[in-house]
């Protein structure tokens, strides 16, 4: 039997797909955006999806839809919205309603009591307000929880990882926070890939260890057709939205 996951801020289901390849199964996913939910249904057929604002969704409802009780989930996974911590935004942190969604994530963890949780967010979370936001998040996530007469507490580990160091053709630094109620610190995996320069300097490195490139990932695709008028119009609309997004 596969280990059950509660997926929060699921987006298109990228984390879910990754964990499914590691032997886990998403029991319930929570996502507000209708387009993301439509994509989720394609990527995760048969998975129960709660479409709505997590501020208005109780942990009891999440567990009920996922057909679980507290202590039964193996994992809670997700990446709460990162705009309030992003170096590219106004960086309002926990003063931004979106920043407070991190606390909603922790609320679901504390009330569902999974064996472990994995949270992903932008690197900027580590230095917002001289690290006070991260300290507040870690303090809240590690506090003692009393359930059914027993006390539980999550042991936390965090690290800033770059996806390019693990075979992804993209420089993408993210903080990964892992907590477990077993009491053991999580050891993050060592990088599997290095820069071409490092590979050349180390005789024991092979070509498979070098950073992957975009060509490695999509070089075998057939040539793209000429864009249609519809595609060009949509592209212009998206560009205007990016310019005027207000962050």
Where are these regions (language model features)?
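Core alpha/beta nucleotide-donor-binding catalytic domains of modification enzymes
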Residues: 2-113, 123-136, 142
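Generic structural "secondary-structure junction" signal
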Residues: 56-59, 87, 96, 124-127, ...
